[in-house]
Each structure stands twice: as C-alpha cells, then as structure tokens.
Amino acid sequence: MRQTFQPSRIVRKRRHGFRTRMSTRMGRKILNRRRTQGRRVLCA
C-alpha cells in the first residue's frame, strides 16, 4: 500500500485553484460561501 497523498503543486492549483473556482458557477458559489464564513484562505 502506498500513501494516497502524492503532492503536486500543478495538480493542486489546477483542481482547487482560484481561477478554476471562478470559471464555473458552482465554483463561485463555493468562494462566496467561504467568504461569508470568513475564511482566511479561500482556495489553493
């Protein structure tokens, strides 16, 4: 069994990055929800 988390900065940014979130309607909903929660970090 290998470790399931294989870190990659490129994959992290592409899947959970700000621009990816902004590109879809649901992604913008996620960002707004995190803003109202008062999160310091909105996304990767």
UniProtKB/Swiss-Prot annotation:
Pfam families: Ribosomal_L34. GO terms for cellular component: ribonucleoprotein complex; ribosome. HAMAP family: Ribosomal_bL34. Gene3D superfamilies: 1.10.287.3980. This is Large ribosomal subunit protein bL34. InterPro entries: Ribosomal_bL34. It comes from Ehrlichia ruminantium (strain Gardel). Coiled coil: none annotated. GO terms for biological process: translation. Keywords: Ribonucleoprotein, Ribosomal protein. The lineage of its organism: Bacteria, Pseudomonadati, Pseudomonadota, Alphaproteobacteria, Rickettsiales.
